[in-house]
Amino acid sequence: MKLKRMRFPLALLSVLFAGSCFHAAFAAPTFWSSVGPDGGDARRFAFDPHDPSRIYLGTTDSWIYVSNDGGSSWSRLAELPSREHLVIDSLVVDREDPSTLYAGVYVMDQTDGGVFISHDRGRTWTPAEGMRGQSVFALVQAASAPNTFVAGTLKGVYRSDDKGLHWREISPPGSREVHEVQSIAIDPNDANTIYAGTWHLPWKTTDNGAHWNGIKDGLIDDSDVFSMVIDRTRPTIMFLSACSGIYKTDSAGQLFHKVQGIPSTARRTRVLMMDPKDPNTVYAGTTEGLYKTQDGGTVWSRTTGPDLIVNDVYIDPRNPRHVLLATDRSGVLASESAGAGFISSNTGFSQRQVAALLADNSHEGTIYAGVINDKTYGGVFVTKDFGRTWKQRSEGLDGRDVFELAQTSDGTLLAGTSDGVYRWNGGVWTRDDSVTGPVTVPVAPAHTRSSRTRESAQMRQAELRRAEEERAAAHRVHVSAIQGHVTALVVMGDAVYAATAQGLFRSMNHGVSWQGPMLGASTPGVFAGAGSYYAVAGEGETIFAGRRQGIVMSENHGATWKSVSFPTGLTALHTLAVAPDGSLWVGGREGVYTSTDHGLTWTRFDKLPVTDITSLAWNNKLQRMVLTSGQDSLIFAVDPADKTWKWWNPGWMVHSVAALQGRLVAASMFSGVVVQPQPEQASLSLNSGGGQSAQR
């Protein structure tokens, strides 16, 4: 079985995850507040056995949350050290000492992870030395021997008998069978009897790993075993879930039989959970909702909609009617009716992947966030009180990812999605992106300095333009609607420009209809390189549009275009912007480049201590060019006149920044919208990097 997660587009990820080793002169982060939107991916629960209302929640991005009110509200507790993007698929609270917690983690699509231990109720964590670098998919504490922990990893099965201080492999080293261990179960009466669910059938040992036996009678061959649960009162009874369905054994694994009642489309059951007071009641969290049996597996019924992906189930041991679900996309759901109905319970929990951030032009404190990878649980969210409360505003988007947000001159909201441009009409998003007609325009060669006279250069360009018009006429692209990924929406006066996988489009009526493609994804001629347009920027009549390795320019609102010389040394363009003084800024893999002559010459901004630029945007309130980098969590604000800069370290990897009510807000990769704790002070101190620190 290959584990994957949905991610940002590859081009964006290659920038955002470039690394985080950075200059020591920069201050340690003071984490800005994550204010939502609430929800996102929730992975794993654990609760204090002495106080079940204290619940811990693991995520896919190294963070652990805690609730002290049974899951009604959440707060960030700690980020696991060592590296980012750890998937916390195992959380254990020590039954003897609830101040001690254990986390089993891995990195998606990589061989990395380990076991982390906390002795202060989850506030600080240290890695267990014997498990460094292990992809840990399962971690269980033995009920009959509290000092004993068993971990299932990519390599095999590991055991500790001193509460995680030392570990040893108890599966055959280098085994081609007992490896890729996704789930672990331990006999509640015998810590030497261990079940290991692998990506290719389950295994069992009754002598602490000295011998292992495959237990596959009754199972479909090559079944990935995701979860196993043992009846605490009758340990011979066990349920396991596999990609081929749910199975039950009454003989401690000697023979399994497949349970009926769960459709084949929902057979990827990620978790099985038994009611602590009634072992005949079992919950099955699947990729198509929550199922439940109350008669030991004979009859199953679905208690949620089929669009829910359930990762974990919490059942209150004091009151089994209180049930929580950890889900993909929709975060935490709560039921007070033993799963008969659920409501969102995400206050304080935000693991959203925010791709677009927009501050309302007219309403101070109003922020829009465009979310990706959350299907119908995502889309667009709005807050009118600076992030204290959010409302989903996604009607009509039908689960599409939102990569761009813009507000036209009359206040109309536009959303650039994974499939076209949508316009908000006050109650629903409508796809008013019909294209009125093809517009294929000539592109002249890149202009460079030459000893020729201006007149001769203009004559040569005119000849090339006429020849290009003749070739272009045969290649006009007819598009009925904007389709595919919209990478940028830029408002310039009454015009809106959309950079898309099909090319560049323009609207002159606030997004009701569009003209284009002005430049197609395969525009013929002297502009080398076909493909998507990723960035658009401009000032006045001048517009720039960028591909990964090319820039074009129009000085007449897009009527005609010419190619601009590409910065020497830049291998991939990610973003571009224009300052009020007309200077062109380009950000990419090798850093920031600027031009004051429309791309005739370029200067690399080599004093800036970062490369891999993810965003560039002029900020009117700061009167500076604000940029972010995939190298680290720093935000820079550069004065275009003298190239001095100040910086902030919000503690999050961000890729879009806005100023609102005297504070900065930013879109983070997996933690929603983050906001400065309070307004920045006017006084600034010089840092060793040649810029000014805005850190407090």
Each model region followed by its residue ranges:
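Extracellular glycan-interacting surfaces
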Residues: 4, 8, 13, 17, ...
